[in-house]
Every structure is written in structure tokens, then in C-alpha cells.
Amino acid sequence: MRFRNPVRRALRYVLVDRHRAELRAHVEEARALEKLGAEQTAEMQRQRLARVLTHAAVHVPYYRDLLPQYGVLDASGNARPERLAELPFLDKATLAEQFDRLRSDDADARDWVVNRSGGSTGEPTRFVQDRGYRAWAEAVKVVRDAWAGIRPGDRRALLWGSARDLFEGREAWKTRLRRWSLNQLWINAFYASEEAMASHLAQLRRFQPTYLLGYAPNLHELALFAERCSTRVPSLRSIASGAGTLYPHMRDDIERGFGAPVFNRYGSREFGAIAGDCELRMGLHVAAPHVIVEVIRPDGSRADPYESGEIVVTSLTNFSMPLIRYRIGDRGATSDRRCACGCGWPLLDRVEGRMTDTFVHPEGGIVSPTGLIHLAGALVREGWIRRFQFVQESVEEVTIRIVPEGETATAAERHGDATSELTQAVQEMMGPRSRVRIQFVESILPSASGKHLSTICKVKPSPGATLR
């Protein structure tokens, strides 16, 4: 299946490979760095961070002013990477306000482009990324793919939904040729009716991919549909969840529905590949040559291993716009285990989803709706819920939107006991003051980035609010 067509090989060279000498060098380096032990990996990251900080202090106006205030530079102007935790965080508002001052004054020599986030939680965020960053982001993806048994050129199908990446009928001919040359099939995850999912499965069976990448909720829904229809895609060797939170019950359902192992991936527009499962799936290996990941408490201190907190990321490869201690907007936890696979890159124990996925408790603090999602997931497996969404409308009001199987108009009568169980679960989590409304709907629209959001909170938590 790998580039046997000479026309495909030639087209890949014209559109892709002739520009990728830098990528190939980075892939070789990343494969060597993957073999480092934990202590050697930490030293490698320290050296790479020192280069980023030294560059930022000289060439990035924002950091030229900021870094000397926090003792990150010694008397000779050399960076002190061990002082990283003393630097203030960079948030999306500051990135927008200081965009020009965050861009390096030597960026024009680095072949930079402006990229944007998907905007699932509001307006998309702009940032600059250069050729070196792009090559490194792709290189760590190649290493990560190898953990899942995927090689460059293997047939890949992508169940994707970002309007920026995929919109039927509007792709340029060069984009289509590029995807054909790369052995890729793109399927629009925006379309999720039963007719659309039957079409998706038919396309997959015709294309015979060895690898399927998609949004976790969309993969989950398609896998359940495939199971109901007794339809398999026998060519699949592995599946990757590339966006959205992959909950344990979802992983189990996807593996059962498609008959292939699921690998969890964590990344973003700002940083590309951040972390991912290896073949042992003991946690997500952070892409150590590419990023540093911290998990912080509400007071800004670093969380202990396995303690839930806010994820903060520092780029080690984007010199045109270094994002240092960037609040990416997600929750998760680190791990102190050393993976038996032999890779010394640090582990994330889990990624819990967006910071905005948490709910505000009427009596103070924030609560994680993970238990609700597990409960709703069990009802999905019972076969009467197609899709669900929990929305906190106010401090004391939660709406549960449900797309049922069968007639929407009669769903409340048919499933009263199950909805009572959901209502009770919300009230136990949110307290006796909470009011819960069940709303049966025909469909639930995805976010602007194409993701199905299982939870939405319209209430702003108090500063420093902690998990209850």
C-alpha cells in the first residue's frame, strides 16, 4: 500500500519531498533523542530552552523587556533555564495584544507564516510559525506514528471537521493532489447523520486505510454505528484520537467497533504535536525535543504528579514567535512513571479536556463533569442516545441536550427512567440548589473547529477557584 504507484511517488516528490531535507534531518535527530534516558532528556530540554530564552532576550521585543525582570538572564546575558517557573504565563489575550512585539525581529529569515487556532472557545488566536518549527512538529509526528506502527506513505484516512482544513467542494486542486500523493483520504466529520456515517464506512472500506485519525467523539460515534451495522474496516491496523478528550469508555467502544487499537494524541494549532501514546499506552509521552509541558495549580505553582491542573506549554523550536509558558486552555496531569518502552520523554498521565469543560459549583469552586460523561456514555452504549451535551447555563442551571435514536417527540416518554438517572447525577454533582432541564433535540452543532463539545460552561469561575 506504500507508494507503489510511480505517478504517486513522482507527485509526492514534486509537492512534498523536495522541500523536506530539513524534515528528514529532524526525523533522524528525533529518533536518536527518543532513545535518551530521563536524565539525558531533561538535560537536552534544558539546553534547548536556554537557546530559546537567549534568542528571545535578544530578538523578541516582548521578552527583551520581560526576561531581565525575572532573573532569567545572568550578568553576561546568558539564559538560566532553571528559572523558567518564575516567568509569568502567556495567555491568549496577551498574545493578541502583543502580537507584533512577540514576533522575532529576525523572523523574515525564517520563512514564517501566520497560523490560527480553531477557535472552539471563542475567537481564533493568531500566531507565527516558521520553517524550523514546522519541520520539528512534523518530525515528532513521524516518531509518534511509529509508536502506533504507522510508517510514512501508509494509507491514512482522516475523519476531520475543521472548516479551515476541510470543506467539501472548496479544496484547491493542489491540496487534493497533495493528499492523493500522500495516500490520504479526508472525510468530513461535520456530516454525522446515519446516511453520512454509512457513506463514511463505505469510503473507508474502498480506500482500505491502515490508519484512521479523527476527533474522539466522531470516532466514537462512527465506531458505535459500525458495530450496530456489523461493518468492519479490516485493513485498519491502528486508530488515533487526535482532538477532543478520549475517555476510557470511548477508547473501549472504538476498539471494539473497529477491531484495532486506539492511540491517544494531544496537540494544538499553536504547538502541533505535544504528546501521544507509545505502543504500551502507559501515558502520553511529551514530545520533548519540541515542547516543555507543565501542569499548574490555580495559584501558579506546579502541580504534583497525577494532580489535576492547567496545562502550560513552552515551544522549543519556534524562534520566530517563541511561546513561553503559554496557557493553552486545557486541563491534565503529569506522571512520574518511567515507561517500559525505553523512551525517556516525560509522561502526561492524562489530558482531561478544556478548562472551560469544568462547571462552577453553586457553593464555590469548580467541578469536573467526567462522571456525567461516563454515565451518558453508558446510555449511548445502551443504544438510545446518539449524542449528548451538558450545558451550564447559570450557576444553578444545567441543560442536558440529547439527540435520541428514533422519534425526538416521544423520547421523553420512552426514556423517562434513564433521564431521571441523569438528572439525579447532575444534582448530586452540583448540589441541591441546581436545576436540571432535559432537552431532546434533532441535532447538536459542532464548534467552529469541528469538534463536538460534550460540556459547555457559560459561567465564569472565580479567580483561583479549585476543584471540589
Each language-model region and where it sits:
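Conserved AMP-binding/adenylate-forming
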Residues: 246-338, 355
